[in-house]
């Protein structure tokens, strides 16, 4: 009986570790996508000024890695997190296909606000599921972690 309980605890611990790693990857990709949307919907002048900096700081995954992330999300992510992530990518898709249609101030602000809202919901869902808000770090008087 104790052996089975230990196996179950280990399986739960393993699943949590997989999920935490996956969620970090999903959040990184979602934030990178949001940054890219902001770049491609900018005016021609702004894009030209940002091009070099963007090329150095673009953290979007290559296609194969994105596919792996999506497959892992299908297996390990909760329906809520997977749904929010997929919604963010679906909102971004038309912008990626036709960025010129989203370069007016109104269209740009609308799509960036929508995707920022979804990203905020995604981050909140991940924090809830991982219990990140329940974790407290004890700090000493100098602000360093003491344990």
Language-model-derived ranges and their functions:
Residues 2-147:
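Conserved non-transmembrane functional hotspots
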């Amino acid at each position: 009986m104790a052996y089975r309980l230990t196996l179950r605890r280990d399986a739960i611990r393993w699943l949590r570790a997989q999920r935490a790693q996956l969620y970090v990857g999903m959040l990184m990709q979602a934030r990178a996508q949001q940054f890219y949307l902001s770049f491609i919907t900018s005016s021609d002048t702004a894009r030209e000024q940002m091009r070099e900096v963007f090329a150095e700081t673009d953290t979007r995954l290559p296609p194969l890695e994105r596919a792996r992330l999506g497959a892992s999300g299908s297996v390990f992510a909760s329906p809520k997190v997977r749904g929010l992530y997929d919604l963010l990518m679906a909102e971004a898709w038309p912008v990626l296909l036709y960025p010129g249609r989203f370069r007016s101030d109104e269209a740009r602000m609308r799509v960036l606000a929508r995707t920022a809202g979804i990203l905020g919901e995604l981050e909140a869902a991940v924090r809830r599921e991982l219990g990140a808000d329940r974790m407290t770090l004890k700090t000493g008087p100098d602000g360093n972690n003491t344990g």
